[in-house]
Amino acid sequence: MDNARRKTPARLDAACFWQIWQRFDKEEKGYIRETELDAFFDHLLAKSGTEDTLMEENVQKVKEQLMTSHNVSKEGRILMKELASMFLSEDENFLLFFRLETPLDNSVEFMQIWRKYDADSSGFISAAELCNFLRDLFLHHKKNISEAELEEYTSTMMKIFDKNKDGRLDLNDLARILALQENFLLQFKMDASSTEERKRDFEKIFAHYDVSKTGALEGPEVDGFVKDMMELVQPSISGVDLDKFREILLRHCDVNKDGKIQKSELALCLGLKINP
């Protein structure tokens, strides 16, 4: 395995690998089928832009080692992580997989990150702001990299996650980078519930977003709630839209105008009467 890794084309980076991978894993499940492996390697060789026989032999060796090792599941699935580790450097692997190791399960935490790095409150993350995010990320994981490498990795991340190629990332792009888990509110069916069930669900919902446990939603807690609420009816919202919806919610629910949404205020907005 080590020899095969050393001989595979070093020019392949995370962005290039991701571009090829997406052809086969369009739903981003994180694996491809064993039956798709030949086509995957054909695209890999074509993307490398060379007809080097030695390289083709090495790719074939990687495939053989992959099939003879325990990297193929009983269902015939091959994980992206297994293939990427054979072709990408340690740092390039890190760019693809750091988010899989520490996925976010709470929109409040996600919005804290969004607000921190959208420093100019434009509703987008620029390349410079993404660079700051990656710098902090590498430091958090105790990885030392040069400024030149940081610029290169920022460029790579933009290639991978800037879906509409406008040179900036929106809310949905960052959610993909951070592997934000499924919308918490999807599990609740408020309209189809009895009054008691709605009250019980409300308690769960409020507790989920009241991360600080103060009895009021404020700052990123409001942001997280608004994001999840709006995405129930509009699957893809921008940072600008989120700010608009946030203002509307505060205008309607923040009765005492303290910039927070008290538990009783949110209940009133949702047409519920709760015990003090």
UniProtKB/Swiss-Prot annotation:
Disulfide bond positions: none
Binding site for Ca(2+) 2: 73, 75, 77, 82
Gene Ontology MF annotations: calcium ion binding
SMART domains for this protein: EFh (SM00054)
Record GO cellular component, one term: extracellular region
Superkingdom of source: Eukaryota
Location(s) in or outside the cell: Cytoplasm; Secreted; Cytoplasmic vesicle, Secretory vesicle membrane
Binding-site positions, Ca(2+) 1: 25, 31, 36
Binding residues annotated for Ca(2+) 5, in chain numbering: 210, 212, 214, 221
Membrane found in the keyword field: yes
Topology in the lipid bilayer: Peripheral membrane protein
Binding site for Ca(2+) 6: 254, 256, 258, 260, 265
InterPro entries per record: Calbindin_Ca-bind, EF-hand-dom_pair, EF_Hand_1_Ca_BS, EF_hand_dom, EFh_SCGN
Matches recorded under SUPFAM superfamilies: EF-hand
Keywords: Calcium, Cytoplasm, Cytoplasmic vesicle, Membrane, Metal-binding, Repeat, Secreted
Domain EF-hand: 12-47, 58-93, 105-140, 149-184, 197-232, 240-276
Ligand binding (Ca(2+) 3): 118, 120, 122, 129
Binding site for Ca(2+) 4: 162, 164, 166, 168, 173
Membrane is among the record's keywords: yes
UniProt name for this protein: Secretagogin
Species this protein is from: Mus musculus (Mouse)
Lineage: Eukaryota, Metazoa, Chordata, Craniata, Vertebrata
Gene name for this UniProt entry: Scgn
